[in-house]
């Protein structure tokens, strides 16, 4: 059975690739959160433990209407509807019949999946932000393997969609 299409979904500070600080986004962009929801509803989402914990802290529960797969060696028994896996490979094997999966962070998970990604949905936030989590260097990978299929500028940020070249 073919593996699902892997889409990386991230909001990144344009100048220094910051994606987080103290387990939180360093910005609040309502339009980006709405886009995140619209893209991911009904699809599995893959994340690291810290990203999962920050979502639960913010929402009081895991993401609704999505199958949450968390990369961790720790038990998530308090969240029986959330699946935990020790590796990306085991998580992907568990969803082999799915059409696509969205990788939603954090830093380590982005690093480990960037090379295998089939697409990227990025929000590039203008400015230089203080942070402790960073998106991996991606410009060369995009240049060599992806085509920009959508670029939508907004006030202070832009959405960019990249698809893998055939």
Where does each model-flagged region fall?
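Enzymes that bind and transform nitrogen-containing heteroaromatic metabolites
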Residues: 2-166
């Amino acid at each position: 059975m073919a593996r699902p299409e892997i889409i990386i979904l991230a909001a990144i500070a344009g100048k220094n690739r910051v994606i987080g600080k103290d387990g939180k986004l360093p910005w609040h962009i309502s339009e980006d959160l709405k886009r995140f929801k619209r893209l991911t509803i009904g699809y599995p989402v893959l994340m690291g433990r810290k990203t999962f914990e920050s979502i639960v802290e913010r929402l009081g529960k895991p993401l609704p209407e999505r199958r949450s797969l968390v990369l961790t060696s720790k038990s998530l028994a308090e969240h029986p509807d959330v699946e935990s896996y020790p590796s990306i490979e085991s998580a992907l094997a568990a969803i082999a019949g799915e059409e696509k999966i969205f990788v939603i962070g954090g830093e380590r998970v982005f690093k480990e999946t960037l090379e295998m990604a089939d697409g990227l949905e990025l929000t590039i936030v203008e400015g230089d932000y203080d942070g402790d989590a960073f998106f991996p260097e991606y410009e060369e990978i995009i240049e060599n393997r992806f085509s920009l299929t959508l670029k939508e500028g907004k006030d202070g940020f832009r959405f960019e969609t990249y698809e893998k070249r055939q």
